[in-house]
Amino acid sequence: MKQLDYLRTVPRSGTGAPSVYLTFDDGPNPVFTPEVLDVLAEHRVPATFFVIGAYAKDRPQLIRRMVAQGHEVANHTMTHPDLSACGRRDVERQVLEANRAIRMACPEASVRHIRAPYGIWSDDVLTTSANAGLAAVHWSVDPRDWSRPGIDAIVDAVLASVRPGSIILLHDGCPPDELANTDASFRDQTVAALSRLIPALHDRGFIIRSLPQNH
């Protein structure tokens, strides 16, 4: 498997300002996804939400809100397993059921991208994604916000690593198998960091854009 089989960064094109891309994994969460959406709306910037299908099924109103606010809803599988430990049929089921759940929640959603749970890719995952018309997207900036390192640490980690074309990984929820851990689902640090990151990125000359449809 080659790294080029999935997108780590978006190549810069044209002569405009350098672009960066905000992405959120593991939602929608009933508490923190609305807060993330509020911050994005305040600053008028787009994002891509890689949602877990089971959550999309249970919280369709949040999927509809994402789409209504101009964000992209993307596939993060149905239940967030390690796909490298799954057989081909299980991989197909995880991907296709998540697509169906998103579209049932919001028929207007155009699902174009997928991110493998834990960023673990395999040939089966890439083949299944391509067959479903989904472009595979990884990331290039990971502040490990899920570990709750502190607001300053999240902001500093992003600003230290961001480059033109960077795909920034953040989290608005947590996987189903981590819900028993009380702290795992808290994304208050991510929300607070986001409200500082967006102006800081703009101050550095970056434009926050939606992921390209074709790449």
From Swiss-Prot:
Gene3D superfamilies, per the entry: Glycoside hydrolase/deacetylase (3.20.20.370)
Localization (cell): Cytoplasm
Site (Raises pKa of active site His): 145
Keyword vocabulary terms for this entry: Cytoplasm, Hydrolase, Metal-binding, Nodulation, Plasmid
Source organism, top-level taxon: Bacteria
Domain NodB homology, residue spans: 18-209
Family: Belongs to the polysaccharide deacetylase family.
Protein name (database record): Chitooligosaccharide deacetylase
Gene: nodB
